[in-house]
Amino acid sequence: MKDTIRQLIQQALTQLVTDGVLPEGLSPAIQVENARDKTHGDFASNIAMMLAKPAGMKPRDLAEKLIAALPASADISKAEIAGPGFLNFFQNTDALANRLDAALADAHLGARKAGPAQKVVIDMSAPNLAKEMHVGHLRSTIIGDSVARVLEFLGDQVIRQNHVGDWGTQFGMLLAYLEENPITSDELSDLENFYRAAKKRFDESEEFATRARGLVVKLQAGDPDCMALWTRFKDISLSHCQKTYELLNVKLTMADVMGESAYNADLANVVADLKAKGLLVEDQGAQCVFLEEFKNSEGEPLPVIVQKADGGYLYATTDLAAVRYRSNVLKADRALYFVDQRQALHFNQVFEVARRAGFVGHPMQMEHMGFGTMNGADGRPFKTRDGGTVKLIDLLTEAKERAYALVKEKNPSLAEDELRHIGEVVGIGAVKYADLSKHRTSDYSFNFELMLNFEGNTAPYLLYAYTRVAGVFRKLGKGFDEVEGHIVLQAAHEQDLAARLAQFGEILNNVADKGTPHVLCTYLYDLAGLFSSFYENCPILAAETPEQQQSRLRLAALTGRTLKQGLELLGLETLERM
């Protein structure tokens, strides 16, 4: 609806330019927002106040001319002026009802991408394979997954890329230890202990350290035996990651792995091409690119080091190779990097170097989707009681157990297998939703008690809200798609629910554009609250007429489908009963 209103305003502006009321050459960003006070309309725009000065008119006078020039629209019942010159628009409830009827018949609930479909690379998760996944990997994994789901739902072609850390000097140490201690995948169930044992051996034995360094050289040279050992370790580590992804209900597979090692063959070419472009400067033996727009506190340009003095390559080199691959081989239109916001400088530098070097041959928009940290109750990065790293799998297991105990306390008569299933859905969903409901760039404190609460903006509340809608149809023995008739909006609670349902597509486009799943979380929470008010004030099963019952059932069905689809786009499973 906002796009419709923007188009109407644009047509009115064009008419006023033709009439000589407005000067030519204006290209304002037309803003349309939801009205704060429904008595003054459903949507509002400040366009008259934005253009009053160039028009040489008072805002209200320009607003009057804009309203007079607005084309007629079946979607808008009337437009009015409020305050100093706001334009307020009232939706036509019949047109709104028709849109919702159409959405109910549509697999995508009426949601369509605002612009043309694109090919989008999502760089997400990226654990270090030398160690087990820890809580620090949660945000990149689930935020990236949710945005990828939304983009696909809206029609984009999404290429997930798990840029795992599978290369570097640490692997020489690990391979040397694995060579000494050949163990199976099951035996290597604790990568943290394996890493610590290898590090202890490295620190205490000069012979072991020398052999480890030798394995790094052999690995980099492509020695077959060394590569076989490295591949075995990598596969074992990736299998651990995959178990975590499956528990998280994240759409990442082995086929999505595109680790650091995948770009090894191109790193020398990256350096050579930067040199050919005249971008390289040698500084203390290292090969660097200096960009004037990135300076230190003394005002000196910061280096982007692409090759160390000893000939080794760095993260920037690998990331430049990845940019070139994603642009020129994958032909991506967008590349979204879901990486800690503390890496903002690094990515801004890499993106600029890539542009200057001509590595972005196919026009590709590069966006660092940075995120804040997950902290403990003390406001510091989440750690174990002894200060160690919290394994992600341990956190998720505890969430399942806590949710299981909570559900069992409330429903002791349920079968054990059902209790376990509900506990897993609620527990994993609670962890994910608590994270996704926070603004991507904000830090937040992890709190099991809050996230497992059945009140407030939590996963348990929304999962229960969905079961409440599903329960209405279970009593009738019908599915969401088995309700006939048409939606008729009469009561205020019906209209409020309908207006929010109609915003689903707009919300998804916002998430797709900005990479902010919390917007979808807020929408679903609002929708659940509006349905609760509707359900309490607009009887469904005890409706006054069959037509009214059908209309309200259709509103309930669309609410149920929207809640289910929205939760699925967040990567949360739903339950038919709790």
Curated annotation (Swiss-Prot):
One annotated GO biological process: arginyl-tRNA aminoacylation
Subcellular location: Cytoplasm
Keywords attached to this entry: Aminoacyl-tRNA synthetase, ATP-binding, Cytoplasm, Ligase, Nucleotide-binding, Protein biosynthesis
InterPro entries from the UniProt entry: aa-tRNA-synth_I_CS, Arg-tRNA-ligase, Arg-tRNA-synth_N, Arg-tRNA-synth_N_sf, ArgRS_core, DALR_anticod-bd, Rossmann-like_a/b/a_fold, tRNAsynth_Ia_anticodon-bd
Record's subunit section: Monomer.
Family: Belongs to the class-I aminoacyl-tRNA synthetase family.
Gene3D superfamilies: Arginyl tRNA synthetase N-terminal domain, HUPs, Isoleucyl-tRNA Synthetase, Domain 1
Gene Ontology CC terms, in alphabetical order: cytoplasm
UniProt motif 'HIGH' region: location: 127-137
Molecular function GO labels: arginine-tRNA ligase activity; ATP binding
Catalysis performed (reactions): tRNA(Arg) + L-arginine + ATP = L-arginyl-tRNA(Arg) + AMP + diphosphate
Annotated protein name in UniProt: Arginine--tRNA ligase
EC number: 6.1.1.19
Provenance organism: Pseudomonas putida (strain W619)
Pfam family, one: DALR_1
